[in-house]
Amino acid sequence: MIKVALVAAVALAPVAWFALAPGDASAPSPAEIAASAPPGDWIDIPESELLLMETAEGGRVVIQMASEFAPVHVGNIRKIAAARWWDGTSINRVQDNYVVQWGDATERKTLPEGVIAKPAAEYFRPVKGLSPDWIDWPDPYAKRTGFWKGWPVGGDGDNIWLTHCYGMVGVGRNLAPDTGSGAELYAVIGHAPRHLDRNIALVGRVIEGMEFLASRPRGTGDLGFYTDGQQRIAIGSIKPMSDAEAGAKSRYQYLSSKSFSAYRDARANRRDPFFNVPAGGADVCNIPVPIRRAS
Protein backbone atom coordinates (compact mmCIF):
# COMPACT_ATOMS: atom_id res chain seq x y z
CA MET A 1 0.00 0.00 0.00
CA ILE A 2 1.28 3.45 -0.91
CA LYS A 3 1.67 5.73 2.09
CA VAL A 4 2.11 9.47 1.74
CA ALA A 5 4.94 10.51 4.09
CA LEU A 6 5.33 14.24 3.64
CA VAL A 7 2.12 15.02 1.77
CA ALA A 8 -1.23 15.22 3.50
CA ALA A 9 -3.07 12.11 2.38
CA VAL A 10 -6.50 13.33 1.36
CA ALA A 11 -8.47 11.04 -0.93
CA LEU A 12 -10.02 12.86 -3.87
CA ALA A 13 -11.40 11.75 -7.22
CA PRO A 14 -9.64 13.27 -10.25
CA VAL A 15 -10.91 16.74 -11.15
CA ALA A 16 -9.92 19.46 -13.61
CA TRP A 17 -7.20 21.46 -11.87
CA PHE A 18 -7.13 24.48 -14.13
CA ALA A 19 -9.25 27.58 -14.77
CA LEU A 20 -10.81 27.61 -11.32
CA ALA A 21 -12.03 30.87 -9.86
CA PRO A 22 -10.81 32.20 -6.49
CA GLY A 23 -12.83 30.71 -3.67
CA ASP A 24 -14.27 27.98 -5.89
CA ALA A 25 -15.66 25.31 -3.58
CA SER A 26 -14.47 22.61 -5.98
CA ALA A 27 -10.90 23.88 -6.11
CA PRO A 28 -8.47 21.34 -4.63
CA SER A 29 -5.75 22.31 -2.22
CA PRO A 30 -2.11 21.57 -3.11
CA ALA A 31 -2.16 18.58 -0.74
CA GLU A 32 -5.29 17.21 -2.41
CA ILE A 33 -3.68 17.52 -5.83
CA ALA A 34 -0.68 15.53 -4.64
CA ALA A 35 -2.78 12.93 -2.86
CA SER A 36 -4.87 12.22 -5.97
CA ALA A 37 -2.01 12.28 -8.50
CA PRO A 38 -1.87 9.18 -10.73
CA PRO A 39 0.91 6.67 -10.03
CA GLY A 40 2.73 7.62 -13.22
CA ASP A 41 3.30 11.16 -11.95
CA TRP A 42 5.41 9.89 -9.04
CA ILE A 43 9.12 9.31 -9.77
CA ASP A 44 11.18 6.80 -7.81
CA ILE A 45 14.17 8.11 -5.85
CA PRO A 46 17.03 5.60 -6.25
CA GLU A 47 18.05 3.88 -3.03
CA SER A 48 21.66 4.79 -3.82
CA GLU A 49 20.76 8.45 -3.19
CA LEU A 50 19.51 7.85 0.35
CA LEU A 51 21.16 8.04 3.76
CA LEU A 52 19.53 6.82 6.96
CA MET A 53 20.30 8.71 10.17
CA GLU A 54 19.18 7.21 13.47
CA THR A 55 19.61 9.11 16.71
CA ALA A 56 20.54 7.18 19.82
CA GLU A 57 17.05 7.82 21.20
CA GLY A 58 15.35 6.25 18.17
CA GLY A 59 14.71 9.18 15.82
CA ARG A 60 14.77 8.30 12.11
CA VAL A 61 15.89 10.84 9.49
CA VAL A 62 16.18 10.10 5.77
CA ILE A 63 18.38 12.28 3.55
CA GLN A 64 18.36 12.32 -0.24
CA MET A 65 21.72 13.25 -1.76
CA ALA A 66 22.20 15.52 -4.78
CA SER A 67 25.15 13.98 -6.59
CA GLU A 68 24.48 15.86 -9.83
CA PHE A 69 25.15 19.19 -8.11
CA ALA A 70 28.05 18.37 -5.78
CA PRO A 71 29.53 15.06 -6.96
CA VAL A 72 32.83 15.24 -5.05
CA HIS A 73 31.25 16.31 -1.77
CA VAL A 74 28.54 13.68 -2.15
CA GLY A 75 31.23 11.12 -2.94
CA ASN A 76 32.92 12.05 0.33
CA ILE A 77 29.65 11.71 2.21
CA ARG A 78 29.06 8.26 0.74
CA LYS A 79 32.51 7.14 1.96
CA ILE A 80 31.98 8.68 5.40
CA ALA A 81 28.59 7.02 5.78
CA ALA A 82 29.80 3.65 4.48
CA ALA A 83 32.64 3.73 7.02
CA ARG A 84 30.08 4.46 9.77
CA TRP A 85 32.25 7.42 10.73
CA TRP A 86 29.29 9.39 12.10
CA ASP A 87 28.22 6.60 14.47
CA GLY A 88 28.65 7.91 18.00
CA THR A 89 29.03 11.55 16.95
CA SER A 90 26.37 14.13 17.76
CA ILE A 91 24.10 17.00 16.84
CA ASN A 92 26.09 19.95 18.15
CA ARG A 93 24.31 23.06 16.96
CA VAL A 94 20.66 24.09 16.81
CA GLN A 95 20.25 27.73 15.86
CA ASP A 96 16.68 29.00 15.95
CA ASN A 97 15.17 29.80 12.55
CA TYR A 98 18.42 28.80 10.84
CA VAL A 99 20.14 25.40 10.93
CA VAL A 100 20.83 22.23 12.89
CA GLN A 101 24.37 20.87 12.49
CA TRP A 102 26.00 17.54 13.27
CA GLY A 103 29.41 15.88 13.16
CA ASP A 104 32.40 15.19 15.40
CA ALA A 105 32.30 17.70 18.25
CA THR A 106 35.94 17.01 19.10
CA GLU A 107 37.09 17.72 15.53
CA ARG A 108 39.78 15.09 16.08
CA LYS A 109 38.42 12.05 14.26
CA THR A 110 40.46 10.98 11.25
CA LEU A 111 38.48 10.98 8.03
CA PRO A 112 38.00 7.62 6.29
CA GLU A 113 40.42 6.62 3.56
CA GLY A 114 39.61 8.13 0.20
CA VAL A 115 37.80 11.20 1.53
CA ILE A 116 39.03 14.41 -0.09
CA ALA A 117 39.59 16.85 2.77
CA LYS A 118 39.55 19.99 0.63
CA PRO A 119 37.42 19.52 -2.49
CA ALA A 120 37.01 22.22 -5.09
CA ALA A 121 34.01 24.48 -4.56
CA GLU A 122 30.79 22.89 -5.83
CA TYR A 123 28.41 25.76 -5.29
CA PHE A 124 26.90 25.82 -8.80
CA ARG A 125 27.18 23.94 -12.08
CA PRO A 126 26.67 24.72 -15.78
CA VAL A 127 23.04 24.67 -16.87
CA LYS A 128 23.99 23.54 -20.37
CA GLY A 129 22.40 20.19 -21.15
CA LEU A 130 19.74 20.53 -18.46
CA SER A 131 16.11 21.54 -18.91
CA PRO A 132 14.90 23.08 -15.66
CA ASP A 133 11.21 23.78 -15.17
CA TRP A 134 11.51 27.51 -14.58
CA ILE A 135 8.78 29.47 -12.82
CA ASP A 136 7.69 32.91 -13.97
CA TRP A 137 7.63 34.78 -10.67
CA PRO A 138 10.48 37.14 -9.74
CA ASP A 139 13.07 36.17 -7.14
CA PRO A 140 15.40 38.49 -5.19
CA TYR A 141 18.32 36.03 -5.12
CA ALA A 142 18.46 34.67 -8.67
CA LYS A 143 17.52 35.71 -12.18
CA ARG A 144 15.34 32.62 -12.38
CA THR A 145 14.16 29.87 -10.09
CA GLY A 146 12.44 26.59 -10.73
CA PHE A 147 12.85 22.85 -10.42
CA TRP A 148 14.99 20.14 -11.93
CA LYS A 149 14.36 16.47 -11.21
CA GLY A 150 12.42 17.50 -8.12
CA TRP A 151 15.13 19.80 -6.75
CA PRO A 152 14.55 23.54 -6.12
CA VAL A 153 17.07 25.52 -8.16
CA GLY A 154 18.19 29.00 -9.06
CA GLY A 155 19.90 30.06 -12.26
CA ASP A 156 21.51 32.98 -14.07
CA GLY A 157 21.45 31.77 -17.67
CA ASP A 158 24.87 30.12 -17.52
CA ASN A 159 24.80 28.23 -14.23
CA ILE A 160 22.31 26.48 -11.99
CA TRP A 161 22.42 25.80 -8.26
CA LEU A 162 20.39 24.33 -5.43
CA THR A 163 18.55 26.78 -3.18
CA HIS A 164 18.61 26.90 0.63
CA CYS A 165 15.00 25.90 1.22
CA TYR A 166 13.66 24.33 4.41
CA GLY A 167 15.13 20.87 4.91
CA MET A 168 18.04 21.30 2.51
CA VAL A 169 21.34 19.80 3.67
CA GLY A 170 24.67 21.55 3.24
CA VAL A 171 28.34 21.13 4.11
CA GLY A 172 29.73 23.09 7.03
CA ARG A 173 32.95 24.95 6.24
CA ASN A 174 35.35 27.55 7.54
CA LEU A 175 36.36 30.70 5.66
CA ALA A 176 37.34 30.35 1.99
CA PRO A 177 39.24 28.69 0.46
CA ASP A 178 37.90 25.92 2.73
CA THR A 179 34.87 24.19 1.21
CA GLY A 180 34.25 21.53 3.85
CA SER A 181 34.83 17.82 3.46
CA GLY A 182 31.26 16.75 4.17
CA ALA A 183 32.04 15.47 7.66
CA GLU A 184 30.11 18.40 9.14
CA LEU A 185 26.59 18.70 7.75
CA TYR A 186 23.67 20.99 8.50
CA ALA A 187 19.98 21.10 7.65
CA VAL A 188 17.92 24.26 7.24
CA ILE A 189 15.24 24.47 9.94
CA GLY A 190 13.90 27.98 9.45
CA HIS A 191 13.06 30.64 6.92
CA ALA A 192 15.07 29.92 3.79
CA PRO A 193 18.54 31.53 4.18
CA ARG A 194 18.91 32.12 0.46
CA HIS A 195 21.89 34.45 0.99
CA LEU A 196 23.88 31.23 1.44
CA ASP A 197 23.13 30.10 -2.12
CA ARG A 198 26.35 29.71 -4.15
CA ASN A 199 28.41 30.17 -0.98
CA ILE A 200 28.20 26.67 0.48
CA ALA A 201 27.93 23.23 -1.10
CA LEU A 202 24.37 21.97 -0.86
CA VAL A 203 24.43 18.19 -1.02
CA GLY A 204 20.86 17.05 -0.44
CA ARG A 205 17.69 17.40 1.58
CA VAL A 206 15.84 15.75 4.43
CA ILE A 207 12.86 13.85 3.02
CA GLU A 208 11.64 12.24 6.23
CA GLY A 209 12.09 12.89 9.93
CA MET A 210 12.56 16.68 10.04
CA GLU A 211 10.83 16.64 13.42
CA PHE A 212 13.87 14.88 14.88
CA LEU A 213 16.04 17.83 13.82
CA ALA A 214 13.87 20.95 13.89
CA SER A 215 12.26 20.36 17.29
CA ARG A 216 15.51 20.14 19.27
CA PRO A 217 16.25 22.56 22.13
CA ARG A 218 18.05 25.62 20.79
CA GLY A 219 21.72 26.03 21.63
CA THR A 220 22.62 29.00 23.82
CA GLY A 221 26.18 29.47 22.59
CA ASP A 222 27.34 31.55 19.65
CA LEU A 223 25.54 30.55 16.44
CA GLY A 224 23.37 28.13 18.39
CA PHE A 225 26.12 25.71 19.44
CA TYR A 226 25.52 23.73 22.60
CA THR A 227 27.81 24.95 25.39
CA ASP A 228 27.41 21.83 27.53
CA GLY A 229 28.40 18.45 26.13
CA GLN A 230 25.42 16.91 27.91
CA GLN A 231 23.11 18.92 25.65
CA ARG A 232 24.38 17.32 22.48
CA ILE A 233 22.11 14.75 20.85
CA ALA A 234 23.90 11.46 20.29
CA ILE A 235 23.79 9.96 16.80
CA GLY A 236 23.40 6.21 16.81
CA SER A 237 24.29 5.76 13.15
CA ILE A 238 24.31 7.34 9.71
CA LYS A 239 24.61 4.84 6.88
CA PRO A 240 23.64 4.33 3.25
CA MET A 241 20.04 3.14 2.99
CA SER A 242 21.38 0.13 1.08
CA ASP A 243 23.23 -0.94 4.26
CA ALA A 244 20.15 -0.77 6.46
CA GLU A 245 18.41 -3.91 7.66
CA ALA A 246 15.49 -4.99 5.50
CA GLY A 247 12.93 -3.83 8.04
CA ALA A 248 14.44 -0.34 8.17
CA LYS A 249 14.55 0.24 4.43
CA SER A 250 11.96 2.38 2.69
CA ARG A 251 11.41 3.57 -0.87
CA TYR A 252 10.49 7.14 -1.73
CA GLN A 253 9.03 9.02 -4.69
CA TYR A 254 8.71 12.67 -5.68
CA LEU A 255 5.86 14.29 -7.60
CA SER A 256 6.49 15.31 -11.20
CA SER A 257 4.72 15.76 -14.54
CA LYS A 258 1.30 17.42 -14.93
CA SER A 259 0.33 16.84 -11.33
CA PHE A 260 3.35 18.79 -10.11
CA SER A 261 2.53 21.63 -12.53
CA ALA A 262 -0.98 21.77 -11.06
CA TYR A 263 0.39 21.58 -7.53
CA ARG A 264 2.89 24.37 -8.25
CA ASP A 265 0.11 26.57 -9.65
CA ALA A 266 -2.08 25.87 -6.63
CA ARG A 267 0.71 26.87 -4.24
CA ALA A 268 0.94 30.24 -5.98
CA ASN A 269 -2.80 30.75 -6.50
CA ARG A 270 -4.76 29.25 -3.62
CA ARG A 271 -8.30 28.81 -4.91
CA ASP A 272 -9.62 26.47 -2.23
CA PRO A 273 -12.47 28.00 -0.18
CA PHE A 274 -10.41 29.42 2.71
CA PHE A 275 -8.55 31.86 0.44
CA ASN A 276 -10.19 35.07 -0.75
CA VAL A 277 -7.20 36.60 -2.54
CA PRO A 278 -4.81 34.34 -4.48
CA ALA A 279 -1.21 35.53 -4.15
CA GLY A 280 -0.45 35.27 -7.84
CA GLY A 281 3.03 33.94 -7.19
CA ALA A 282 5.30 32.04 -4.84
CA ASP A 283 9.00 31.84 -4.16
CA VAL A 284 10.67 28.57 -5.00
CA CYS A 285 11.00 27.60 -1.33
CA ASN A 286 7.25 28.00 -0.80
CA ILE A 287 6.64 25.22 -3.33
CA PRO A 288 8.02 22.21 -1.43
CA VAL A 289 8.19 19.26 -3.80
CA PRO A 290 5.86 16.52 -2.51
CA ILE A 291 7.75 13.39 -1.50
CA ARG A 292 6.09 10.24 -0.24
CA ARG A 293 7.07 6.90 1.17
CA ALA A 294 6.28 4.24 -1.41
CA SER A 295 6.69 1.17 0.77
Specify the residue positions occupied by each region the protein language model found.
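Bacterial N-terminal signal peptides
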Residues: 7-15
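N-terminal Sec-pathway targeting helices
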Residues: 1-6
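Cyclophilin-like peptidyl-prolyl cis-trans isomerases
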Residues: 14-295
